[in-house]
Amino acid sequence: MRLSPLTGVVLLIKVLFLCAFNLVHHHEREKPMGRVDGKVAIVSGAALGIGKAAALLLAQEGASVIVGDINKEEGQKTVSEIEGKGGKAFFLLLDVRKEEDWKSVIEGALSRFGRLDIMVNNAGIAYSGSVESTTLEDWRRVQSINLDGVFLGTKYAIEGIRQHGAGGSIINLSSIEGLIGDPELAAYNASKGGVRIFTKSSALHCAKAGYKIRVNSVHPGYIWTPMVAGLTQEDEAARKRLVDLHPIGHLGEPDDIAYGILYLASDESKFVTGSELVIDGGYTAQ
């Protein structure tokens, strides 16, 4: 069917209008929406990777952020990036295995910002080894960081959040390896599986106590972070094998997880507690 010149012009105008609308709408989506405006967050392991991405995004969306890490140099860089974009943040040294560090960080949040609303227990390490090859020393090291750190962070965050009485959100980073087993990840599986079920216990405790504190776990697939890069040791073939594990066809990026954390931190998830947010490119759907 041949269109008249007038009809063609009208269609062209409509197409141009839709393109302009979509472009404006895209830019609007990129603008901060204040989803956690006025809230105060602590992010452990916020110097690099997922923790850094979460700290940056929470700050962008209006939260004041305590950057906790053992890596002071990189942690200060995270703070500088946040402040450079007009956000509020400061760094506190945090070894998640140490109870005294946790007490200091919670007190630091309360003294600096007067409250605590959000805790992101992100710090963790990877370790590869079967049940036979893993030493007791390595087993305990993995549990002390990945599981003890989440226990301490949750325990003291509850105490800190309760002080203002308005409730809050605790987000614990588990993994797809907390949902499924891997013969070469005995200690890591145990630690991340522990985070998963500990999160549910904590969520029930807070709900039944009437604290208005939600507790949820996030389960990333393989995300291209320094930790995962270290596992592949810059081996392109190893990276391709990781990519092939994900039906979506690529590895995740730190921001993919940060947006999930933001949702759980915000009031948009006010009916979500004791849940598992799996962000894995289809890995566990197979």
Q: Residues of each region from the PLM?
A:
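Residue(s) in the substrate-gating loop at a strand-loop-helix junction
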Residues: 175
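Canonical Rossmann dinucleotide-binding motif of NAD(H)/NADP(H)-dependent dehydrogenases/reductases
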Residues: 34-66
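Short C-terminal tail/terminal secondary-structure segment
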Residues: 14-15, 180, 248, 261-262, ...
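Alpha-helical segment proximal to the catalytic Tyr-Lys
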Residues: 159, 204-208, 270
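Short, small/polar-rich loop/turn modules that mediate ligand/substrate recognition or access, typified
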Residues: 212-214, 272-274
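Active-site helix of classical SDR
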Residues: 154, 191, 199
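Substrate-binding pocket helix/loop in short-chain dehydrogenase/reductase
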Residues: 130-131, 135-143, 238, 242
